[in-house]
Amino acid sequence: GAVRAGALTLLAAMVPFLMASEGWDDHSRARRRTGVDMAKNYLNSLAPNAVLFTNGDNDTFPLWYAQEVEGIRTDVRVCNLSLLNTDWYIDQMRRRAYESAPLPILMDEEKYRQGTRDVVLIDRNSDPMDLLTAMNFTLDDDNLQQFPGQKGYFHLPGNTFTVPVDSASVVASGLVSAKEAKLLKDQIQWTLTNGNGNTQSYVTKNHYAALNMIANNQWERPIYFAVTTGPESYLGLQDHFRLEGLAYRLVPFKSPKNDNPNILGAIGTEIMYENVMDKWVWGNMDDVEHGIYMDENNRRMVTNVRLQMANLSEALLKERDPERAMEVLDELMRAMPKENVPYSRVMMPVA
């Protein structure tokens, strides 16, 4: 009995060592800085004083860490659209944070407190309407719609909106390049759609607050959507996007039609090339000699980065700039080698 008990004790004592040896690479954070370095890449790709809309945990918390702990780009306001459904988070966004000025969500607290304007209906009217006028209509308590047996709802008077554009101002600010200036009109116009491209019949509080921000911003502060947020968060604005790295910037013109299915809107090749080649860091992914373990989340993240770099290279080729297109691909292969990050189908356009 004593021998058996001793053997069982020895076997049980070995279990933690076995678990450690088999799972050490999964859990060790030694030399693994991909999370925070990718957060830096997001932030350092943005224009000064930018607003960045994110949606999930993995595209928000690393950015908050980079700002709160490492002090990276505290002029940028990371705005999580999931949390923007709550009144307390809208309160936060309306206050200054570090070097970031309050976001231009211009409505009194009682207009967005929980239970008020949680859902805003949209009239089936496709006549273009100034977005700020539509916002003011919805904020007027006299425009509450009552339904028999139900509580009242506020509503937007249509689904197609415009935002005015001061051409001289957006060119002078650097938002629009000289070659893009010919695309400018006196306003942008778009229809509010959902993730499937269908016209929406309502918006929830988070998207209503985002629209309020866009209406009041008037192109003064750079607004971006992280590429990972997904089409359900884009408010139908995809035709007015410009890719500048790992985020789409809202621009005051309709982008030329792009035949690349992986791209929404246009690519700002000059800005994105500078971001990729001069600002991005790689969290030791490029260290082939020592190697680095990449878990599932990191591999997913790398797939997205590879895709955006491939898109940039293709756009440079279309601009008849093969030298820089090849430089981007060379950097892609160097920074994310197959020894550390196995290839996936996203590498097919690169082949």
Where are these regions (language model features)?
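ER/secretory pathway lumenal C-terminal domains and tails of membrane proteins involved
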Residues: 1-51, 61-349
